[in-house]
Amino acid sequence: AFRVWLKKRYGTIENLNRLWNTRFWGHTFYDWDEIVAPSMVSEHFEEARSMYQAITLDYKRFNSDSMLANYQAEAEAIRAQIPDALITTNFMGAYKPLDYKKWAASLDVISWDNYPAEGADSAAAAMNHDLMRGLKNGQPFLLMEQTPSTCNWLNDNRLKRPGVMRLLSYQAVAHGADTVMFFQMRRSRAGCEKFHGAVIDHAGHGNTRVFRECQALGMELKALGKAVVGARVPAKAALIFDWDTWWALECS
């Protein structure tokens, strides 16, 4: 599949050699079949560093494009049955493997999962919120996931202190979130995320501090009505966040 992607991008093996400058260190390719995915047994000399940055950079592009093609195929299948469906998928902030800016055009609305660690710098979440909002030129986004209590993959699976979930939720709204949603509604009895937080814990009822906090937040957001939904704020400053540059810099 990588070779097919390269043929579409470069047309001929001669053009690929020219643009990759494969003459350096005698790395010229004479047939498409000679090209393999970069790894420690081919181009890499460290996990993320490459002898031939162009190959590694193109492989990262190919990986992102392949995942995007899979998403687009699934979106087409949904639209064939539900033409007016609003289609999105969970982004994960500044997630390195996928070029979210390229993906954005294929999503009806941007949505992402926010899971800051206990005591994490609030600026990191703020940057990720702004990154998500910028993907569709300022269009408000959806906070698709956050935990109301614990986060199962952290070293310390701590319960959020009183008020922290509310604080993080309003931070998202202030940065342009039109929804505040949770994963998960009811905690799983087994499986990978059985220790991940939920609105309804293993206790199985709503008489818990976490449930009451979620309930109170819902009432507060309902009281706001449409005052903030769809709101836009003219930006006075901007940051350029580019996946191609990120990839190229780190594999050099």
Regions found by a protein language model. Give the residues of each.
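Carbohydrate-binding surfaces of carbohydrate-active enzymes
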Residues: W32-S39, Q72, D84, G93, ...
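Polysaccharide-binding and catalytic clefts of secreted carbohydrate-active enzymes
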Residues: A1-V109, D113-M127
